[in-house]
Amino acid sequence: MQHNLAGKRAIVGGGSQGIGRAVAEALAAQGAEVLILARGREALALAAAALPTPLGQKHRWISVDNAQHEELSASVAAELLAWGDAHILINNTGGPKAGPLLEASPEAFMSAFTNHLIVNQRLAQLVVPGMLRAGYGRIVNVVSTSVKAPLHGLGVSNTVRAAVGNWSKTLATELAPVGITVNNVLPGATSTERLRAIIDGRAAHTKRSAQEIEDEMKAEVPMGRFADPSEIAAAVVFLASPEASYITGINIPVDGGRTPNL
């Protein structure tokens, strides 16, 4: 399906690789002008240069560290002054380190809440005034299926993702009267560097082969495979489009049917 995003400006977190990069590419292909955020300058520059420009868009990037949320806020605010109001915000941040809850330090929880919840909040505060001026606003949070059902071995991630889910639902309710939508896309196991790290970590912890772990994980998915990042991006782009104007406050699992609940 084609979605007309001509004239729309979109901010994409974690846009230099994985799901974030796929989302940035998909938005750009539909005509949006994209600002991607991540830490690595070289990877950002390469990713931005590779984004589609069917309408001659001029894409941008900012090297930022989510852990430094004050600096991130200042950098994005300055960019918006030069660029103009953003119409679309895609909150997307790599997940916390895997492991059981009782092995997680307080610092791990604080870092995860800063990187996900606090950064989402600061970015929303920056972009919503412009969305109101523009008469168009879409906030899409790329979270995890653990919003619906906790995942084994991802204690910190399960905890912070649930917080983001409730933050998103609350914000959706607050912004619904002004027509700004807020939704969550919940990726299942997706072929990214993070998934490879999880597989390798489980293999090392259980002294089994990475292939055995991978096969076991795929067997838990009714469709029998991992998602491609572009499949996650397709759901995000739809929620960011004009066609999704009456959809807000929902969670969309993109997981091949793995999530056990409705």
For each of these PLM feature ranges, what is it?
Residues 176, 181, 247-249:
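Short, small/polar-rich loop/turn modules that mediate ligand/substrate recognition or access, typified
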Residues 1, 149, 236-237, 248-262:
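Short C-terminal tail/terminal secondary-structure segment
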Residues 100-102, 108-113, 139, 217:
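Substrate-binding pocket helix/loop in short-chain dehydrogenase/reductase
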Residues 30-47:
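Conserved glycine-rich Rossmann-like NAD(P)H-binding loop of the short-chain dehydrogenase/reductase
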Residues 140-164, 168-177, 189-190:
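Catalytic loop of short-chain dehydrogenase/reductase
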Residues 9, 16-17:
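Conserved glycine-rich cofactor-binding loop
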Residues 129, 173-174, 245:
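Alpha-helical segment proximal to the catalytic Tyr-Lys
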